[in-house]
Every structure is written in structure tokens, then in C-alpha cells.
């Protein structure tokens, strides 16, 4: 794949998962041996099925919209900074929904291999984000 194709894969990943809520798109875009380094998670997310579970859990709790602010790529790596809007719509880790909405920016780095996302690094201020949504300090 070309660098431009890598960038298009990452843009599609974000659109399908967050904006279209299509977790099944991971069957095509996510490598079976995916590794996710997700800020705030105590352990690595390992494998396509674990990745699907992670996204499904977030999408069950929040209405989310993601807009990329910028994107660049070199070799097999793609970096993107996103502006994220979310609203609490269902239980989150046993806490009832607050109905509040908030914004967040994130920085993601993706490693592409064989036309799929093989590895992802996600950084964001989860604590501030959850406080803005009314969940208090975590």
C-alpha cells in the first residue's frame, strides 16, 4: 500500500467506527493480531475481537462524532489528531447515563501492515473528558 492508501485506511477506520458506528468494519480493517496501546487502559488490547469489544463498549455508552484536525503519514505509520464530541446515553462502567455532552481531543498513531491496522497508540485526557460528562474523577 502507498502512504496515501494508509491515510485513507485510517480515515475510513475513524469514519466507520465512530461516525457510522460500524464495528463490523473491523473484520476488514483490523489485523487479527492487532495491538492497542490505549491511554487509561490497564492492559494492552490484543486481537481483533478485543478491539471490537472495546469499540462496542464505548459506542454502547456514548453517542460519538469524530472529526480529524490533521493527518500525516510516513512509511507504515499514520498519525491523526481528532476533535471528538460525545454524549453520555447509556450506562458506563455501571454508572447511569448523565445525558451530558463534552468534547475531547485525541492523538492516535497507527501502524499499517498488509492493508490493515496492526497497531494503535491512543492518547487523550480521559479524566477531564469523563468529568465534563458528569462522571466525576476517575
Language model segments and positions:
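C-terminal and inter-domain tail/linker signature
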Residues: 1-138
Amino acid at each position: 500500500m502507498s502512504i496515501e492508501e494508509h491515510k485513507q485506511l485510517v480515515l475510513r477506520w475513524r469514519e466507520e467506527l465512530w461516525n457510522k458506528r460500524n464495528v463490523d468494519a473491523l473484520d476488514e480493517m483490523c489485523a487479527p493480531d492487532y495491538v492497542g496501546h490505549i491511554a487509561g487502559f490497564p492492559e494492552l488490547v490484543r486481537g481483533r475481537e478485543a478491539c471490537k469489544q472495546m469499540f462496542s463498549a464505548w459506542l454502547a455508552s456514548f453517542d460519538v462524532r469524530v472529526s480529524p484536525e490533521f493527518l500525516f503519514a510516513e512509511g507504515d505509520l499514520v498519525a491523526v489528531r481528532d476533535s471528538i464530541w460525545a454524549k453520555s446515553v447509556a450506562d458506563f462502567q455501571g454508572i447511569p447515563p448523565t445525558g451530558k455532552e463534552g468534547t475531547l481531543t485525541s492523538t492516535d498513531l497507527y501502524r499499517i501492515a498488509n492493508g490493515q491496522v496492526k497497531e494503535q497508540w491512543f492518547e487523550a485526557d480521559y479524566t477531564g473528558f469523563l468529568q465534563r460528562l458528569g462522571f466525576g474523577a476517575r
